[in-house]
Regions:
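Non-catalytic scaffold segments within catalytic domains of secreted glycoside hydrolases
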Residues: 1-255
Length: 255
């Protein structure tokens, strides 16, 4: 209600709450540098329910301006079940992700924020293999996570339109940043070709920034050096082959 008077010219999507599942998992705040959400305990059901109520109330208020489109943004993981552990995966995934995705059904859009996959076994998350390629956050390098998350969200949110509100990689190697982003967007394009309504893609992020207590995980398409001087990276010209045309068609040329 307080900010509505300054939103009269807004015509883009607004998320009243960013990553409510992460808010619930951390109970509103936590310390430390553990970048892997799968390592966190299940959220308190009361906190999760309160977040859903707050989201719906915020959307009710925002709907007073018909130009504003609203929906919240979910931290998604491409969950995989180890053989015979499908039930355990569903029980693990539901309170951490699907509960919040279900609550978005019928919204103007739902934001998908995807970077990685997590395997679930009988006792919960399975450690990443020692020989797997990792990013600077310690996550497995897995570009297909975006396409998997888009497809899963489309089904759970009952065909609510999707905006990719975060996707990217923390790396010091711009060649791998280009590879990751090309392959992630290719998965998004395949989902769109299959009829999934994806209305936009936002990369995380343009510039390196302060992530989880450190400047170390460099997500930026452009880097920041000493003295906060902006330095061009190879990633920006390297991604010039990704073209998003009017009508939602995504064309990917040779990288």
């Amino acid at each position: 209600r307080y900010v509505m008077p300054i939103l009269h010219d807004v015509t883009v999507g607004l998320p009243p709450i960013n990553e409510p599942n992460m808010v619930a998992l951390t109970r509103g705040g936590t310390e430390g540098s553990d970048f892997v959400a799968a390592s966190l305990p299940a959220p308190d059901p009361d906190i999760s329910a309160t977040l859903v109520k707050a989201h719906r109330k915020a959307r009710e208020i925002l709907s007073g301006n018909p130009r504003i489109k609203s929906g919240w943004t979910i931290a998604c993981q491409a969950f995989h079940a180890m053989p015979g552990c499908e039930r355990e995966m569903e029980e693990y995934q539901y309170p951490r992700e699907d509960y919040f995705t279900e609550a978005a059904a019928g919204d103007d859009f739902i934001g998908v924020q995807a970077y990685l996959r997590t395997f679930i076994g009988k006792d919960g998350p399975v450690p990443i293999p020692e020989d797997a390629e990792r990013t600077l956050t310690g996550w497995e390098y897995f570009p297909p996570a975006l396409g998997i998350a888009i497809r899963h969200t489309w089904n759970v949110a009952k065909r609510t339109p999707i905006i990719v509100t975060e996707n990217g990689i923390a790396t010091a190697d711009d060649r791998r940043r280009i590879d990751y982003t090309f392959d992630a967007i290719a998965g998004m394009r395949d989902a769109m070709d299959d009829g999934i309504d994806v209305r936009g893609y936002l990369h995380w992020s343009l510039l390196d920034n302060y992530e989880w207590g450190s400047f170390a995980p460099t997500f930026g398409l452009a880097s920041l050096g000493q003295g906060h001087l902006r330095t061009s990276s190879e990633a920006i010209p390297g991604l010039a082959g990704v073209n998003c045309e009017n009508g939602g068609h995504v064309q990917i040329e040779d990288r």
